[in-house]
């Protein structure tokens, strides 16, 4: 009788699921740690913007102190997210930001977006944006910190993975990385395996949200508009998206953006951090659990 042979099971790839802190601006860094843990997250994508506990005025010292505190709590901080208007590597706040990240051990910085207006010279804007990103790369190389650019639907460069690679192709991925957003991809993007294959060599971190095109009252133009919802309630095909990431060997972080019940008028305003979504903590906790389950099952 032949001995029973157990089938080989692939070892599960551990990933970090972190909470984007933009809707938690009133919390101290200590309270942010407690909140992230309570909601089931592994750490924080820390917002570095005016009015937040870590901000452009104090980032050089506040960020290292915050990350040291979070580390004691077993939490990670894989990303610092800046104002959506920060697109100049020579801006005075850039050096303290990158210095603070280097001192804190935060490996990457998300900068702002390059806007597009009807009538603009697209390829001229792309070339200008690439020069800007090369400038951020030089700053990042000095400090050992990568700059990432996020996919964001709407009138900005890099509104899908193809557009993002217009900006990134040929730049050193050690210092300029791709930050695909699974929710924005379902609105303006490509099929997940194809889009993620485009950014594979520059893939750094992944943004998580869900969205769909919601019907509007009869006679509205257009009759459907984008709306963000909790994970699993929108059009994102999670098994396909996460399966595509697994197929690429992705083992990095997911930043959960906790954007819920926002409609077209808000979504297309890039960086709308002043609006607080309903059911924030309840749905954020559900998002973390949903994403872990989908990652295991994909």
Residue map of PLM features:
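Histidine-acidic metal/acid-base catalytic patches
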Residues: 8-21, 25-40, 105, 161-176, ...
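Active-site acidic/histidine proton-transfer and metal-coordination neighborhood
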Residues: 3, 30-33, 69-73, 86-178, ...
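Conserved beta-strand positions in the central sheet of alpha/beta enzyme cores
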Residues: 45, 79, 110, 148, ...
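Active-site-proximal loop/turn and secondary-structure-junction residues that shape catalytic pockets
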Residues: 23-25, 48-50, 83-86, 113-117, ...
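Short catalytic-loop micro-motif centered on adjacent basic/acidic residues
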Residues: 18-21, 79-81, 148-150, 179-181
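Residue-level detector of anion-binding/catalytic polar loops
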Residues: 42-43, 76, 107, 146, ...
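Glycine-rich, proline-tolerant flexible connector loops at the mouths of alpha/beta enzymes
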Residues: 45-67, 116-121
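N-terminal export leaders
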Residues: 1-2, 7
């Amino acid at each position: 009788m032949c001995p029973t042979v157990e089938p080989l099971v692939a070892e599960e790839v551990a990933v970090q699921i972190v909470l984007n802190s933009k809707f938690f601006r009133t919390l101290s860094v200590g309270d942010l740690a407690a909140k992230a843990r309570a909601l089931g997250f592994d750490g924080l994508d820390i917002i570095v913007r005016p009015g937040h506990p870590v901000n452009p005025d104090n980032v050089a010292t506040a960020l290292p102190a915050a990350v040291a505190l979070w580390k004691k709590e077993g939490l990670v901080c894989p990303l610092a997210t800046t104002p959506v208007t920060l697109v100049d590597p020579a801006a005075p706040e850039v050096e303290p930001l990158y210095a603070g990240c280097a001192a804190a051990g935060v490996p990457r910085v998300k900068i702002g977006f390059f806007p597009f207006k009807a009538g603009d010279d697209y390829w001229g804007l792309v070339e200008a944006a690439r020069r800007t990103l090369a400038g951020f790369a030089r700053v990042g190389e000095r400090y050992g910190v990568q700059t990432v650019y996020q996919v964001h639907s709407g009138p900005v460069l890099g509104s899908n993975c193809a557009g993002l690679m217009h900006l990134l192709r040929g730049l050193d991925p050690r210092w300029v990385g791709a930050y695909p957003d699974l929710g924005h991809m379902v609105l303006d993007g490509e099929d997940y395996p194809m889009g993620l294959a485009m950014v594979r060599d520059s893939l750094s971190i992944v943004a998580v949200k869900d969205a769909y095109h919601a019907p509007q009252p009869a006679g509205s133009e257009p009759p459907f508009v984008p709306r963000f919802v909790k994970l699993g309630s929108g059009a994102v095909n999670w098994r396909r998206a996460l399966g595509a990431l697994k197929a690429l060997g992705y083992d990095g972080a997911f930043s959960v953006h906790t954007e819920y019940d926002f409609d077209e008028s808000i979504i297309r305003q890039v960086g709308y951090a002043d609006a607080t979504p309903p059911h924030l903590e309840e749905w954020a906790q559900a998002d973390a659990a949903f994403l872990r389950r989908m990652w295991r099952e994909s």
